[in-house]
Amino acid sequence: MLILRMKKNYPVLIFLLFLAIVSVFYNYDEIIFLRPQSIHKWRQSDNASLALNYYQNGMHFFSPETHNLTSDGGTSGKCCPSEIPVFYYFIALLYKLFGYHDSIFRLLNTLIFLLGIFYLFRIFRYFLTDVFWSIALALLFFTSPVLVYYGNNFLSNSSSFAFSIIGWYYFFRFAEESENKWFYVSMLLFLIAAASKVTALFSVFAIAGMYFFEITGLTQFAKGQKLFQSKIRIPASMISIVAIVGSWILFASYYNQKHGCTYFSTTIFPVWDLTGDEIVGVLEGIRNLWLEQYFHASVLVFLSIC
């Protein structure tokens, strides 16, 4: 029985083995014990500070603050980020259980990120069924310098990205199996992702677009039946996610105004506010500074061909 189970799960075991080997190759096992540093170290420190302040100052969820005294005329650190600080609060709870160690923050962020890569493998496995390509394509994403660097960092972006991947896995299962429970699981995961980083709402917007196209009869996603069967619960769940995240952003704006905090940005910086020269400058920055940090040129060519 054990041998049969191992044969059935050998693709998962092989992938996890490769994932562990690559993680060690990237020195994840050593980096976990480092404090915030290098690129984006100021925002890393902000996140670490938010978690530590919860731990030190009473676990008041709606009173986030940092150690940087930029609020209330330079007398407090009360400042609220645009993301819902559930992640930082949970880190503070772990500090309560195990004591304050920065490695806890990095370790949790790393585990969530690697879980996201694992679910990316599951997505490929679900659709391709080919073991080699499922493993290879999932690990290919793990060659991105940007993902590798932020994957075990103090920023919540990588965790948000991971929860989005997991959410899409369950949405695909909903689409293929017509099981509504998978839709609601995916919505819960997208909520967690958007709570960690508001840009994760794009996943919800994409699904809302699918819903709109189907109910208006512009297209059909399921054979012989509608993909979105419920006319109330499905749109209500998507609206609820946007409402929860939007409500927090409004609260964050109010909280920051109340305490005179301008440290965190709780607004948008749309492209239409830029001049033509500024837009060209951004595109030049992407081409000259960042493009190869996303993926090696050979990978970009491969993805373009695909």
Question: How would you describe each model-predicted region?
Answer:
Residues 125-132, 167-183, 193:
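Membrane-interface transmembrane helices that cradle and orient dolichyl/undecaprenyl
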Residues 75, 138, 183-198, 204-209:
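Membrane-interface alpha helices of multi-pass inner-membrane proteins
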Residues 26-50, 58-70, 78-90, 100-103, ...:
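Extracytoplasmic catalytic/substrate-binding loops of multi-pass membrane glycan-assembly enzymes
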Residues 104-128, 165-170, 306:
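Transmembrane-helix motifs of polytopic, lipid-linked glycan transferases
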